[in-house]
């Protein structure tokens, strides 16, 4: 069945008009046709779309004005006998099920894909009164939070004054004597921890419209795979699955049965075949079940949830004024959120799916404008999204597809309270996709609370494991030897390829960057204290190769997707082995090889034992000095697997503005 838009506006429904749903009895799994009968003219016209029906279906159906009656279809323009019959059920406008009304929307997934098999979510039409979920979806504007005077201040400082009990309401918060400071204490304005005590209005989930979320149509070639074929395919690609009724993996893009607009985007991107996480993750996500995905960075996780999300959007009713997004993707950092949005914009353009990125450190105005205009996909960091929800700029009542990307990192950064508040605003029957690179106990515990009967797919091992295509070189040196060794490495390695250098502190990151530029190296630095405009500039310069050396703290360790990073240098060893895995994972992406150098000092000795295990598992040569350190440090135990808290707010360093003196040739 094909649909086309109507140039003229749809007729206004009246209470005395009759609505009808026609079901092709010869093909009971095809979509139902919604029509509208004008009582005056007797003509049938759709409210939102002009249907081009099957030649064997009637263009005009005889409608009894009372109950539903089967009627035989007559061909519109010939006397040949019909091969199809249609059962017609009629209801008055006031009794029409709003779930069935969505089939008049030309953007409906099944309207656009008549080749789909499988019954709709609701097997038959019913009057609204007979369906407990049939209350029409009419989202109201978010109720403004009205705390008592001086109850909350995002950061201490100036702002709207409150009463004597606190620092006022608003971003600044001034007013009477209040909590103030970062975690309370003297001063003016509320403390930042006041965010945790603020509760968003509790939504009412008693009346929910059912929605469609199972879009998977198994390809005949996939159906034909035997259990032995499936096991062999998974074993060759190191895929482990858990769960009930796990779908078979798809080996080629065509086997996923994506709509044409997704296939066009895939073809234009030049991908050859799905990555392991995509081959198994796509069928899981398209089936509409909750899922857990555990895979290394650079394994193609973003498209694993993004393409099914685009299909999900296409199957839902259109956004109305005041609606929030349909797909919500939470990410831990600004950089990762921006990169996801770039992919969403690229692939969503083929289906005219709108998306926006909501993150801190950037002006709120453009983000608020996008939300008020209406977008189907929102990619956000938890803190800024809560700001938008508090301000009533958006709501999450339409969210039916939730993605938590790099959940382990979000927990490490202390976002668990914000995540819980956000999830509490989303309908409980949503589809949730939970992505992580590791599977510590805290991540598993949160997944148990948010997911229902999930699939689980693991690429490789859930334990700490480095990418085998990366050569890891550990150099045991002292602190004062680091910079001379870095200069020597750059002299040996620099040929115009991209080199990423990681530091533990923002201060050292800027300090070494200044020294590198003074020594003639084209280096730029990026970390959490940089303004967003400067961070965007640094990333653009690094990606383009104009400044092929980038110094960074762990703000760029996750989600940074830059092609052809030749080498990663850990100037400082991170505070967790998880961060070590993710740092070196910036090179060797998408099957390419890479090299990672790490400066390891005596102060890092507590990580030596577990680091040796990681190296041996990846088939790397272990430095004898590191092995000796691991033996002597055995009494100290393994490394700490929990990372530090979030950094503070400092001043811009100006390290990127230092002129490069006597640029070195390479």
UniProtKB/Swiss-Prot annotation:
Residues noted as binding ATP in the record, renumbered to the chain: 295-302
Keywords in alphabetical order: ATP-binding, Helicase, Hydrolase, Nonsense-mediated mRNA decay, Nucleotide-binding, Nucleus, Ribosome biogenesis, RNA-binding, rRNA processing
Annotated EC: 3.6.4.13
Lineage: superkingdom: Eukaryota
PROSITE patterns registered for this protein in UniProt: DEAD_ATP_HELICASE (PS00039), HELICASE_ATP_BIND_1 (PS51192), HELICASE_CTER (PS51194), Q_MOTIF (PS51195)
Catalysis performed (reactions): ATP + H2O = ADP + phosphate + H(+)
Subcellular location as annotated: Nucleus
Comp. bias regions, Basic and acidic residues: 80-92
Alphabetical GO biological process terms: nuclear-transcribed mRNA catabolic process, nonsense-mediated decay; rRNA processing
Segments carrying motif Q motif: 251-279
Motif DEAD box: chain residues: 405-408
Comment, domains: The Q motif is unique to and characteristic of the DEAD box family of RNA helicases and controls ATP binding and hydrolysis.
PANTHER family: ATP-DEPENDENT RNA HELICASE DBP3
Entry protein name: DEAD-box ATP-dependent RNA helicase 30
